[in-house]
Every structure is written in C-alpha cells, then in structure tokens.
Curated annotation (Swiss-Prot):
Function: Probable toxin that inhibits ion channels.
PTM annotation, UniProt: Contains 2 disulfide bonds that can be either 'C1-C3, C2-C4' or 'C1-C4, C2-C3', since these disulfide connectivities have been observed for conotoxins with cysteine framework V (for examples, see AC P0DQQ7 and AC P81755).
Signal sequence, start to end: none
Major localization class: secreted
Name under which the protein is recorded: Conotoxin Ama1251
Any one annotated GO CC term: extracellular region
Subcellular location: Secreted
Description of its domains: The cysteine framework is V (CC-CC).
Tissue and organ expression note: Expressed by the venom duct.
Highest rank taxon of the organism: Eukaryota
A GO molecular-function descriptor: toxin activity
Length: 11
C-alpha cells in the first residue's frame, strides 16, 4: 500500500 506523511510519500 502507499503511505503519505507530511511532504513525503512512500508506495
């Protein structure tokens, strides 16, 4: 899945 925290996202 994808995670987004503040200005950075990881998929």
């Amino acid at each position: 899945d994808s995670c987004c925290i503040e200005q950075h996202c990881c998929d």
